[in-house]
UniProtKB/Swiss-Prot annotation:
InterPro entries membership: AAA+_ATPase (IPR003593), ABC_tran_C (IPR032524), ABC_tran_Xtn (IPR032781), ABC_transporter-like_ATP-bd (IPR003439), ABC_transporter-like_CS (IPR017871), ABCF_ATPase (IPR051309), P-loop_NTPase (IPR027417), Val-tRNA_synth_C_sf (IPR037118)
Record Pfam families: ABC_tran, ABC_tran_CTD, ABC_tran_Xtn
Domain ABC transporter: 132-350
Family as reported in the entry's similarity comment: Belongs to the ABC transporter superfamily. ABCF family. Uup subfamily.
E.C. designation(s): 3.6.1.-
Enzyme class label: hydrolase
The protein's name in its UniProt record: ATP-binding protein Uup-like
Positions that bind ATP: G164, P165, N166, G167, C168, G169, K170, T171
UniProt-annotated location(s): Cytoplasm
Bias kind Basic and acidic residues: ranges: 357-375
Region (Disordered): 357-381
A single GO molecular function term of this UniProt record: DNA binding
GO cellular component: cytoplasm
Lineage: Bacteria, Pseudomonadati, Pseudomonadota, Gammaproteobacteria, Pasteurellales
Length: 459
């Protein structure tokens, strides 16, 4: 995801024109100022951002459907006229006949809107309340620590996204849970009554030599979902595989078609634990949105590995973020909520470290000041410079508090973490520095106030 964000910001800074193709809605929303839509062989240009495109496209399709309905009604009326009796045919208007032929040709060439996949899950019996327990789990391979002293409890109904760069250990984490590999140290306990459906990013569950139909039904004509028998060809049409395409070998399919096929096969399995490892690769936006709806309503436990930020945000209720050197932290919410919490966490850590550093300074200076106050009461009076400083400190404190409020508001904005890392890091550092500066200024104000009170005989 860091690479995606870097590319976004690199392209946003680019001064020339950019043409890009993407199914990543976050990328499109952030970058596109004009969208060219390819629909049924026709290109249509939409000015504006992605959300405006969706609204305009929906309205265009509504108008098109209405126009087609009126056209078909008129065509049916003309067909009735041309089939009238002998008398009507003798007196028919040749121009009207030619117009009817043109209408029939126009109707023949019309390309209907491509359907969307119709997905449904074969639900299973409920698992036990505890699905997985991990206690101080670590995992190392080839001298590299992927996981260090991690503990968690995954409960029935949890929807967790594993987020991190390639190679950080997301798939390894899943293999640890499933018992395919053993941890270097720590304990992992599995719950009861688990029925697992696993979407593998490598599509290992598909036989490339078999045709689409046989991959799903294993040579049978019927499949069963939720206790109801279906013909396999009818089921595959819901995943946008017409009968002819259902007879095609898997090795001839596109990446998107293979992912749809894997979903078709996966969703047939009764399950209460669904593991999706990069399910969004090559899926079109309509199928993505339908999958999101299904996962939102899913009653079982869900584990997701994905680089699609919008997909995670729409499906996950908790995120596990891989932060390097074996660190894995848990954050409540979708992707953007998790990233904001992560930034706030590390910003507060930075403030704590700075505060500790100040407290650990040698105490000699503080002791000398105290001795000076007790042994030299005559010199306790504020100097002119200190008096000026004391007068200016309230204004400085107010300015620092205003700056902190402004920075906190910027960081709380969900769009904040869509900026380049150097920008977000600079803002987070500025917040930590300003909070430290405020603390220092406040301590100085207290010190000067105390000195002034001593001079005035109030202490």
């Amino acid at each position: 995801m860091e690479a995606i964000e870097w590319l976004e910001n690199f392209l946003l800074d680019f001064q020339g024109s950019i043409v890009f193709i993407s199914h990543d809605r976050s990328v499109i929303r952030k970058m596109a100022t004009r969208i060219v839509d390819l629909d049924r062989g026709q290109l249509q240009s939409y000015l504006g951002n992605y959300d405006l495109y969706l609204t305009t496209k929906e309205e265009n399709l509504r108008v098109e459907a209405l126009q087609n309905e009126l056209f078909d009604k008129r065509l049916a009326q003309e067909d009735v006229w041309i089939r009238q009796g002998i008398k009507a045919r003798r007196t028919r208007n040749e121009g009207r006949v030619r117009a009817l032929k043109a209408m029939r040709e126009e109707r023949r060439q019309r390309r209907e809107v491509m359907g969307t996949a119709k997905l449904q899950l074969d639900t299973s019996s409920r698992s036990g309340k505890i699905v997985f327990e991990m206690e101080d789990v670590s995992y190392e391979i080839a001298g590299k620590t992927l996981l260090k002293d991690f503990s968690t409890t995954i409960l029935r109904g949890d929807k967790i996204a594993l987020v991190g760069p390639n190679g950080c250990g997301k798939t390894t984490f899943i293999k640890l849970l499933l018992g395919e590999i053993q941890p270097t140290s720590g304990k992992i306990r599995c719950g009861t009554k688990l029925e697992i459906a696993y979407f593998d990013q490598y599509r290992a569950d598909l036989d490339p030599e078999k045709i689409v139909m046989d991959n799903v039904a294993d040579g049978k004509q019927d499949i069963e979902i939720n206790g109801v028998k279906r013909h396999v060809l009818g089921y595959l049409q819901e995943f946008l595989f017409p009968p002819k395409r259902a007879m095609t070998p898997v090795k001839a399919l596109s990446g998107g078609e293979r992912n749809r096929l894997l979903l078709a096969k996966l969703l047939l399995k009764p399950n209460n634990l669904l593991i999706l490892d990069e399910p969004t690769n090559d899926l079109d936006v309509e199928t993505l949105e339908l999958l999101e709806e299904i996962l939102t309503d899913y009653q079982g436990t869900l584990l997701i590995v994905s680089h699609d930020r919008q997909f995670i945000d729409n499906t996950a209720t908790e995120c596990y973020l891989f932060e390097g050197e074996g660190r894995l932290n848990k954050y409540v919410g979708g992707f953007f909520d998790a990233k904001q919490q992560q930034a706030n966490f590390w910003a507060s850590k930075a403030v704590e470290e700075q505060a500790k550093a100040k407290k650990s300074e040698p105490l000699k200076e503080e002791s000398a000041v105290k001795n000076d106050r007790t042994s030299k009461p005559k010199s306790v009076k504020l100097s002119y410079k200190e008096q000026r400083e004391l007068e200016q400190l309230p204004q400085l404190l107010e300015e620092l508090e205003t700056k902190i409020t402004t920075l906190q508001a910027e960081i709380a904005d969900p769009a904040f973490f869509q900026q380049a890392h150097d920008i977000t890091d600079a803002k987070l550092k500025a917040l930590a520095d300003t909070e430290a500066e405020l603390e220092t200024a406040f301590l100085r104000w207290e010190e000067l106030e105390e000195k002034k009170n001593l001079a005035d005989g109030k202490a």
